[in-house]
Amino acid sequence: LRDFPTTYVNRRGERVVTGFDVLLVRRDGQPEPHRTERLANGVRIWIGDPGVYLSPGLYTYTITYRTDRQLGSFADHDELYWNVTGNGWDFPIDDVTAQVFLPGNVPADGIAVEAYTGPQGDRGRDWAAEASTSTATFRTTRGLGPREAADWLLRSCVAPGGARSAVPRDRAALRGAGGPVTGLDALPEADEV
């Protein structure tokens, strides 16, 4: 299972619903059966064949999806707020690392990262981040317990509004990996959005 929130309230108090379509799910590079279920505030992806039990071990899952309305554009910055892991896990996650590649040539001092760890709504500070040209990397500094998540807020203070105008020509990717769950969640090419 992987839950993706698609409904939220923005800073102006308006209800926002984002698009979300699963394009492909893979396990260890091979297509994996999946289905989606609507939730009150999002979409749940059920992954795998319910009649097939996997042997204990490490598996890599890749979820490719299309989403929209994820970038916020403000007077002094653009931002991406992302729930990297989701909160729906019934087991602990040993560690989480996520990386975002920004369009264009954004200098490291034009990127600000803030993050939160813990149960939904918590503002835990168990994380570290670094930025380099057009790239920001975030990682947790402790494992996450069941139903805990890692969220991050990435701000680009260079050419506000540029993220929206650059997206159709460039790729922005969010990669998440964590403990027993390792995968790639991606914001696809904007011409797919």
Please annotate each region the language model reported.
Residues L1-V193:
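Lumenal/extracellular ectodomains and adaptor appendage modules
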